[in-house]
């Protein structure tokens, strides 16, 4: 059996076959890849050709918005996307996404230190509340009352190493290199996939398609997480 990079990050160093292993990073499918799967050739051509910030004509804006809403519902996880593309039926999407979340949580139990499992779950399930609030940074008190950074930093590191979540540190000034100006005490944490965030928040498809005032404000969290997801693909460097 193989070990996850997240396990290795918290385990003791061991031998490694240098030069004999190729690493392949696989991320959720992007919005553009969904348009390709849906054969939206006109929309793809427009996006590929657009290089300015001028307003988008309604002929493209409206279908792009509708497709983006669809992407928020389906996300980029391959099984969910394949089911939608092949069957055009949203009824089974939430079940697929929930199964992925349950698989993640079972994988959390394989953490080298069993005592870290509850902490992994607390951080994981705090994502919706972290992103729904007007927070400038990740708040440990939203993970668990009385939680402190030093108690949860190993668990958070595991989730980041496993690429289940993405951690984005704040920079103290916009200067290069950005890594030299990281504020280690201030960062935000995002889900790897926007639709997994929706299911983690227990928002079903009908609630999203027909929103009430109760869930309208949470759409900002979806947009923020989607932008992070898109930037992660566009820039093959740690985001800040």
Task: Please tell me what each predicted stretch does.
Residues 4, 10-132:
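Interdomain motor-coupling "hinge/lid" segment immediately C-terminal to the ATP-binding subdomain
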Residues 9, 65-66, 183, 210:
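Generic hydrophobic-segment detector
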Residues 9-10, 199:
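Conserved protein kinase catalytic core
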Residues 82-240:
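Accessory nucleic acid-recognition modules appended to NTPase machines
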């Amino acid at each position: 059996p193989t070990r996850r990079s997240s396990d290795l990050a918290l385990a003791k160093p061991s031998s490694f076959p240098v030069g004999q292993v190729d690493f392949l990073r696989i991320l959720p499918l992007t919005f553009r890849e969904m348009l390709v799967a849906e054969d939206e050739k006109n929309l793809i051509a427009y996006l590929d050709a657009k290089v300015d910030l001028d307003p988008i004509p309604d002929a493209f804006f409206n279908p792009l918005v509708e497709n983006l809403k669809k992407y928020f519902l389906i996300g980029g996880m391959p099984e969910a996307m394949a089911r939608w593309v092949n069957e055009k039926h949203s009824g089974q999407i939430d079940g697929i996404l929930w199964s992925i979340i349950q698989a993640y949580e079972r994988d959390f139990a394989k953490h080298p230190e069993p005592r870290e499992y509850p902490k992994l779950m607390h951080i994981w399930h705090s994502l919706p509340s972290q992103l729904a609030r007007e927070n400038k940074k990740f708040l440990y008190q939203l993970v668990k009352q009385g939680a402190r950074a030093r108690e949860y930093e190993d668990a958070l590191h595991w989730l980041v190493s496993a690429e289940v979540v993405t951690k984005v540190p704040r920079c103290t000034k916009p200067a290069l290199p950005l890594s030299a100006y990281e504020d280690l005490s201030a960062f935000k944490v995002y889900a790897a996939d926007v639709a997994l965030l929706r299911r983690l928040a227990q928002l079903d498809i009908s609630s999203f398609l027909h929103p009430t005032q109760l869930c309208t404000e949470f759409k900002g969290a979806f947009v923020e997480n989607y932008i992070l997801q898109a930037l992660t693909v566009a820039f093959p460097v740690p985001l800040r």
